Amino acid sequence: MERNVVTAARRYCPEITADMDIQTVLEQLLIEENSQELAVKGPLKLKIWKGSEAKRVDLSDFTYGVVLNSQTVKHAMVEVEQPALKKIVTIENKTNYLAMEYDPEILYIYSHGYFSPLEREFLKKLQRVIEGKDVEVFHSGDMDYGGIRILNISRSIFSRE
């Protein structure tokens, strides 16, 4: 059954490419085997909802970074005011992400390869907040086909048009 789903997805879904492994294809279809986690490091202010109540969280307090599980990503809103944020860097490689020294003006986001649809929605929320503001966006990734595809996905999320 899994093979049939993956084959059909590769044939009919333009965002799915031949270089994606089975797990990545399933994630793109919102079929998750395990909980997704988004690792970030830097000055990001969130509002996390639980029912009708929201708690403000300042991730700059976590100078070594923090991992947001899928439920947190789903229920978090990016605060409109992000005064310290001057640069966003998406990073494909975990070792490179971990090696990035904390900078109070840079938000590092570990992509672990392709961002899941849930992560892309969260990053689009971030994009809407920084739109029209003086925030630069960069990507660090491998210089191979997959790395270029991830760069293009990151560009589509953080489009400045």
Regions found by a protein language model. Name each.
Residues D103, D134, L151:
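Active-site lining segments that contact anionic ligands and/or coordinate catalytic metals
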Residues D134-D144:
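Acidic beta-strand-to-loop metal/phosphate-binding motif
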Residues D142-E161:
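Gly/Ser/Thr/Ala-enriched C-terminal appendages of enzymes
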Residues H112-G113, G141:
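Short loop or secondary-structure boundary microenvironments that flank
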Residues M1-T90, K94-Y110, S116-R128, G146, ...:
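Nucleic-acid enzyme cleavage-core boundary/entry regions
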Residues I130-G132:
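Glycine-rich phosphate-binding loop signature in dinucleotide/nucleotide-binding domains
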